Amino acid sequence: MNYTEAVDYIETIPKFTVKHPPEHTRELLSRLGNPQEGIKIIHVAGTNGKGSVCAYLNAMLLAGGKKTGLFTSPHLVRINERFQINGEDVSDEQFLNAFLKVEKAAKEYEAEGEGHPSYFETLFLMGMLIFKEAGVEYLVMETGLGGRLDATNVVEKPLACIITSISRDHTEYLGGTLEAIAGEKAGIIKAGVPVIYDASQPGPASVIAAKAKEMGSPAWPMEPSFYEMKTQSREGITFTFAYPGGEKAELAIPYVAKYQMMNASLAFYTMHILQDVHDIPKNVLAEGLSKIKWPCRMEMAAPGVIIDGAHNEDGIAQFVSTAGYFAKENEITILFTAVADKHYHEMIGEICEGIHPSHVVATQIDGSRVVPAEVLAEDFRKAGCTDVCAEPEIGAAYEKALGKKGSGMLFCVGSLYLAGELKAYLAKRNG
């Protein structure tokens, strides 16, 4: 089997198996030699921002000269993106080698009457092998869905657990209230392991604090009052960070979104708490933050063109806060799509009310969760936007939106799938 065949096979896995309890994943890890053991792991859960927090942590560890692994999801263009070693995607050879070992163990387990690991479980198992064989010292690991029952939660003794902002997403799996969702995310907390969490919402924060107390885990709430913005421009944000009793740090990030201050601060606070483990000076940590590379998070993909992966109500609210800042001085064009299981009516209403875009192009992501471009366009019209058109094909939609942009700004938003498709399209377009 070659790399392409392996990827094709992995993509078929959801058609013939289901998610399994953690014991199933633990058994397969054991059969693979428990590759996760001996790696210093930071475990990150949350609804929004967990990928960014992972990227900030990875950037700071790299700045400090550490050999790192980064496990995140979803991928935007190529599946290899889910596994990074020292900031670079793993090679096709590393990917295939890990897949063959995992698939061999899975087939043997199946022969004993057990189920094949799910899509995400397969990738998690592959990741643990990839990082062990690469000899990484630190692994920054993002949960797939939720926390308590996530495959990543089989890791028994991480260095720290981080929980980012909580919002209503995947409610059919995680519960309908913020507190219920927070309870699922807090399931990653391990006895005695420090937990650092976004404390900006009292309900979820109280659930996380209670779980930490139950587990005997030191709890470090990250309050919005710990950071203060100094400047915001197209180049990024500068801000100060100081926890009570701590000295003030001057930080800079190459992102325009205000919400990234919380994500960067969560990561910086975690590295402060783990100072005795990594021994990286604070000025080096700050330098690492400033050099982060994490695609499609308010990313300037071309002059005046920003791609953002916001794909639920809270994410869109944060997006609107940032885009609204630029709308004061620029004519705004929106390229938008969403999938059917998101609250896209509310997302569209938020965009129209908060930004009042001059132009809107609606497009669609084909597949089982498709929302036709014309349906989205009609929602924009009902929400009060006037210059709205529908273009189902993403490349053509981008060109149409770019044509409407003029000297203003174009924001592409609504779905991580859209972000990935646009990244692939722009790579081809720009040669």
Residue ranges of predicted features:
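Short functional linear segments
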Residues: 1-46, 53-66, 71, 107-115
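Nucleotide phosphate-binding/pyrophosphate-handling subdomain across enzymes
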Residues: 38, 138-143, 149-162, 166-170, ...
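Acidic, Mg2+-coordinating active-site environments of NTP-dependent enzymes
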Residues: 110, 135-142, 158-250, 264, ...
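ATP-dependent carboxylate-amine ligase catalytic core
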Residues: 29, 34-37, 63-156, 172, ...
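A glycine-rich beta-strand to alpha-helix segment
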Residues: 397-427
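C-terminal helical cap/extension that packs against the catalytic core
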Residues: 201-216, 304-305, 348-409
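Beta-strand->loop->alpha-helix junctions that form or flank phosphate-binding loops
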Residues: 198-199, 213-233, 253-258, 285-291, ...
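Short, high-confidence coil segments that cap the C-terminus of an alpha-helix
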Residues: 134-137, 329, 385, 406-407
